[in-house]
């Protein structure tokens, strides 16, 4: 089984975390954008990741031992904001916020790219 990734996500895919993420991808699932998140919900420096694929959004919150995923579907939205040097990426369904991740602003360009690719895939009806 071979995986073809559409972006250079080498930072996200290195080490044991990368092996775990690669194991979660279907053989025909492409990574379109990746974001390293480096702040926990209580603003401690801990690593995590958020990835948009051709089918879904996958994430491992900083400090978490398991990842979560959401199928890309109409009604899902990613909202990006920053305040005081901290970026926040929020995932919303039509009713509520279902997840959020925090990161230092050095990762803001990755976050912008991730939101853009997410929106493109949702519009296409992934």
Q: What kind of feature is each model-predicted range?
A:
Residues 26-44:
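The phosphoinositide-binding surface of pleckstrin homology
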Residues 2-13, 20-23, 40-47, 60-126:
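Acidic, Ser/Thr- and proline-rich intrinsically disordered linker/docking segments
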Residues 55-57:
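Structural motif
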């Amino acid at each position: 089984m071979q995986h073809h990734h559409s972006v250079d996500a080498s930072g996200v895919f290195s080490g044991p975390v990368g092996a775990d993420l690669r194991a979660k991808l279907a053989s025909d699932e492409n990574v379109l954008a990746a974001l390293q998140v480096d702040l926990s919900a209580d603003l401690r420096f801990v690593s995590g990741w958020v990835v948009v694929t051709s089918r879904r959004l996958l994430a491992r919150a900083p400090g978490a031992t398991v990842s979560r995923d959401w199928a890309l579907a109409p009604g899902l939205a990613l909202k990006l904001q920053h305040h005081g040097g901290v970026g926040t990426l929020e995932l919303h369904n039509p009713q509520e916020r279902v997840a959020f991740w925090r990161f230092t602003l050095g990762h803001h360009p990755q976050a912008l790219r991730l939101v853009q690719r997410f929106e493109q895939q949702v519009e296409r009806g992934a």
